[in-house]
Amino acid sequence: MNADKHKFCHLLAPLFLFSCLLASCSLASSPFEWTGEEEPIRQAYALLQLAGNPFHAQPRTLPYEPVACAGFNPFGMNVFLEQEVELWKREKTVQMVAEAGFRWLRQSFPWEDIEIHGKGDFEDRRHIPHRSAWEKYDHIVALAEQHGLDLIAILTNPPAWSRADGDARGTFAPPDNLEDYGDFVYAVASRYQGRIRAYQVWNEPNIYPEWGEQPVDPAGYTRLLCTAYRRIKEADPEAIVLTGALAQTIGYDFGPGPWTGMNEFVFLQRMYDAGAAACFDVLAVNDYILWSAPTDRRMRPWAVTFARPLYLRDLMVANGDAHKPIWLAEMNANAVPDDPTIQNFGAYGQVTLEQQARYAPLAYERALREWPWVGVINFWFFRRPSDAEQNQAWYYFRMVEPDFTPLPVYYAMKDYITGLTPTLYPGTHQEDHWALAYSGEWETVRDPGAILGAYRRASAPGATLSFVFEGRALTLTPGPEGGEIEVQIDDGAPRQWAVQGEPLRLFSAPRPGTYRVRITLMRGQIGVDSLTVYAAD
């Protein structure tokens, strides 16, 4: 009898949770904001699935753990500038990207297009007149600097000469000698030292055909990654090294062959097993909006949803990498027309242009508010050089037509970014976070005793730090110096605080809210190591 009661209660629990979810949705938000589904029937089914979340193991994300490289301006854009023949089109692309508020360019630096004819040969003799193979990339780097944009350089596409069998194993197959690749990435990183902020080592190594006509190989990729990491850091110790962007896939057919690959969770764990933890600063992942909107909160590791980075974060925490961030290398929804003759129609989902324009800001907003361990998010993609690929589904991720006619998503993202108030959301944020506005004389101090090796310090009275945060409580972790500060929250009365190197709870409220903070140095010194915003006191 007791067993029957237990079984009956077990069956009732999801229904009870389902009822609670319906009530909360009707009172506080729409079902779309919980499920990412637009149609009422699909919303009802999704809410029932959502009620099962508490019965699954939840990812361990450690939201208050300090994370490096997570506080940069998050708005990045994928571009194909190396494929443009006319210089004005490169310039127009970068100009429009910057005008929309994006601050990063993710751009390929193909090995086969730079060290073209043989090892150490950086001359392009494919056309007359011959020219330096660096010329095009020098122009791209200069354009980014001109418009105040940082670069993520993707280092991939080996030349045929790097393999004894040429392209027999595919044009993406790794080189026979990993040191040849190491020499190439060293050449790039040394040439652009201090000018390129970040380097991505390969792309989508967990799916076909990015590892060539052979099964994907996480251990083999890790060896390549570690070689590249060592050589990049030799050339530019300050450069940020990203893994190849892991593709979203639930597949376990390791290839080769179309639509094959290794589940990115498995691939990442096998990378860790092979020693990858010592060989990257940032985990790069692709996070497409495929079958539901980015508001989908169902936790289903067997489904490809926008929430998949939560599981990758869980793996990073389990492997001792909680201090490293995830960057989203490619993110967008596919606005393919309703034409089944288009190659791979429906393979990337299908949304309208209006939905694409709504979903992109929602994706950024969710990551900013809920995932303090996510850094740069790169929209996929700005435009293609021509419309020759309009018979392929992937073409319809574009933001702008080849003739530079903007689509609705361009205006939606421009309005979102330019209207955004940079804000600290719940989590621990480092002293270099993009939402922090320093005024007066501040310096960066390298200190192994700091949380992540550095903090910001002011010594002259009158130096200020201003920012907006959203939450219930705020804690300042200062540097080791002693001094006195004045803290003003919104239009409230300023309060004096003695700073002696210990964390200070600067603010606490009974309920979450949005608050403006101004910290002023009155005397002595003040160091800012981190700021922690709490969702609950």
Place the predicted regions along the sequence by residue.
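Short, low-complexity, charge-dense intrinsically disordered segments
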Residues: 1-7, 11-26
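N-terminal carbohydrate-binding accessory modules
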Residues: 30-104, 127, 142, 233
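Aromatic-rich peripheral "rim/lid" segments of glycoside hydrolase catalytic domains that contact
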Residues: 31-65, 205, 338-362, 366-443, ...
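Hydrophobic faces of well-ordered beta-strands that scaffold small-molecule active sites
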Residues: 73-79, 105-107, 151-153, 199-201, ...
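Short, acidic/polar
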Residues: 84-97, 181-188, 261-273, 360-364
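Substrate-binding cleft and catalytic face of glycoside hydrolase catalytic domains
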Residues: 100-122, 127-258, 290, 333-336
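Noncatalytic carbohydrate-binding groove/subsite architecture in carbohydrate-active enzymes
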Residues: 182, 217-354
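Glycan-recognition surfaces in beta-rich domains, encompassing non-catalytic CBMs
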Residues: 417-537
